[in-house]
A protein has these predicted regions:
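Bacterial N-terminal signal peptides
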Residues: 9-21
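Sec-dependent signal peptide cleavage junction
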Residues: 19-31
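Acidic Gly/Asp/Thr-rich repetitive segments characteristic of extracellular carbohydrate-active
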Residues: 31-65
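Extracellular beta-strand/beta-solenoid scaffold signature
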Residues: 86-92, 107-121, 136-154, 165-175, ...
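Bacterial N-terminal signal peptides that target proteins for export
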Residues: 1-11
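All-beta strand scaffolds that present successive hydrophobic residues in beta-strands
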Residues: 77-80, 98-102, 124-130, 154-159, ...
Length: 296
């Protein structure tokens, strides 16, 4: 009888562990983890970031809505303890290797125009976003603010199992990014409300200098994105100085009801030499629309 009870207890623990793994929920965090929420030492996410030791420390956020505009200058991992964590605000990234998981970024009833902003003040390498969402921002869900005056580089962005919905200008707008991987994500109704003189897109990449490398989009849906601008599309990529080459890969993606599906190049400039590799793209109306007309 005792052996039977022991075996039953062991089986229960195995089943609980298996269910935790299958649900994708991490229940065991390092001892160094900082917890945020009502009744915890840190009641705001920013206070936990400020207290972190900048060595990839976990910041675990309890269920709830947090109205904050974060500034992240340390390497931290910000993880929702459940799928019920909403950030009504934004996060500005000025550190390498920042990680977000199970955070719902919301632009509703806030002053922030963008969900995540890559700081233009320094080069940033490594941003990982897993199982998050970006909805309802007046500009972009995720944006890099590099420009010709401050052409700081952003490299190694990885986004998985994340949705971008109804962001006014774009789901993602990246200036001067080189390495970019999107996998098992969805983009819907981004760029629909952009002014006609602005480019409404699900994803917009604009490289200021250098070459694209490892730009890949896998198993991702693009539905009803874009506006009436001639360069509007589900996916748009260009290069200001027109002095590069590179390859962009789409693998097992769905395109449905977008203003245009894929656009490369820039108007009024020669061909930009971007190679678009499309593998099993469902609904794609044409491989690529090239904006390479040398108009004067």
């Amino acid at each position: 009888m005792k052996k039977y009870l022991t075996s039953l207890i062991i089986l229960c623990f195995v089943l609980i562990g298996t269910l935790s793994v299958l649900s994708g929920c991490q229940t065991n965090y390092p001892d160094s983890a900082l917890f945020v929420g009502k009744g915890e030492k840190y009641e705001t996410i920013q206070s936990a970031i400020d207290a972190s030791d900048a060595s990839g420390q976990y910041i675990v956020v309890k269920s709830g809505s947090y109205k904050e505009n974060l500034f992240i200058s340390k390497t931290v991992k910000i993880v929702g303890k459940s799928n019920s964590v909403t950030l009504n605000g934004s996060a500005t990234i000025a550190a390498d290797g920042v990680y977000f998981e199970k955070i719902a970024f919301s632009g509703k009833d806030i002053d922030a125009k963008n969900g995540i902003v890559i700081s233009p003040d320094k080069d940033v390498t490594g941003l990982n976003i897993f199982h998050c969402s970006f909805k309802g921002y007046s500009e972009c869900g995720l944006v890099s603010l590099a420009n010709e005056e401050a052409p700081n580089k952003f490299n190694a962005l990885t986004i998985q199992e994340t949705s971008f919905v109804s962001n006014k200008l774009a789901g993602i707008k990246m200036n001067n990014i080189k390495s970019f991987v999107v996998e098992s994500c969805s983009f819907k109704k981004n760029g629909n409300d952009a002014p006609e003189d602005a480019v409404g897109c699900a994803i917009s990449l604009d490289l200021i200098e250098g070459k694209y490398s490892s730009v890949e989009v896998h198993s991702t849906d693009f539905k009803q994105n874009g506006n009436k601008n001639s360069r509007s599309a589900a996916f748009s990529c260009s290069h200001k100085n027109n002095s590069f080459d590179g390859e962009i890969v789409f693998d097992d993606c769905l395109f449905e009801g977008n203003s245009y599906d894929v656009i490369s190049g820039m108007e009024n400039q020669p061909d930009t030499s971007i190679d678009i590799c499309v593998i099993n793209a469902r609904g794609l109306r044409t491989d690529v629309k090239k904006l390479d007309e040398n108009k004067n």
